[in-house]
Amino acid sequence: ITHYLTKMTEIAIKSGGTVDKYIGDAIMIFFGDPESRGIRDDALACVTMAFKMKKALNGLRKHWKKLGLAEPLDVRMGIHTDMCTVGNFGSVDRLDYTVIGNGVNLASRLESMADSNEILISENTFNLVKEGIDCNYFDEIIAKGKSHSIKTFQVAGIKSKQHSSKKIQASKNGFNLMIDKNKINDIDEIISLLEDGIEKL
């Protein structure tokens, strides 16, 4: 567990997250305080961090297997973006720098709902990260303190920057171009056709 928590904490800190607390074998992490890069970038950094953690765990499992630890360690991650209260809370004798609020409770609910070894995010977070993160619709939930259902999404992967735009379209008099990267099987053939067209001009 110490090996696992050490690796996950390292990823969290490098990603700009604040490690709030360890709860058994779980970690609570938040973004946006004491420093924020803006709500969108904070959300993207958090989801990217979770995906890095998921990949790192695969490497740890292989290492543990070599050591003879056959039982896999499964994880679930829940992420929600909301306004929360951050500060020092506790008693006169002991204070903890932590975050509280309904948003924290919803993130915990998402974690408990997530499939094994998956990342589940709220609609709030999805709307902030959908340009950079591939997600699949998962389910709707009724959260405590909310009068409406909340859509949830499962993280599928991080979109490559160079392939973020899948379609290229252009049209002028005597010229039409439409490229759909999702349907291309042989990129070299397409490049050859484009070069051919340029030569004929």
For each predicted feature, which ranges?
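Active-site-proximal alpha-helical element of nucleotidyl cyclase-like catalytic domains
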Residues: 1-15, 52
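Catalytic/regulatory signature loops of cyclic-dinucleotide turnover enzymes
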Residues: 80-81, 89, 102-123
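Intrinsically disordered, glycine/charged-rich C-terminal tails and inter-domain linkers
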Residues: 74, 116-201
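Helical mechanochemical/support elements of P-loop NTPase systems and associated helical scaffolds
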Residues: 4, 23, 39-42, 49, ...
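Residue-level signature of catalytic and energy-coupling elements of molecular machines
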Residues: 8, 24, 53, 79, ...
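Conserved NTP-handling cores and scaffolds of large molecular machines
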Residues: 12, 57-64, 111-117, 133, ...
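Short amphipathic alpha-helical segments
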Residues: 2-6, 107, 191, 195-198
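Catalytic core of nucleotidyl cyclases, primarily class III adenylyl/guanylyl cyclases
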Residues: 11-45, 59-102, 127-132, 150-151
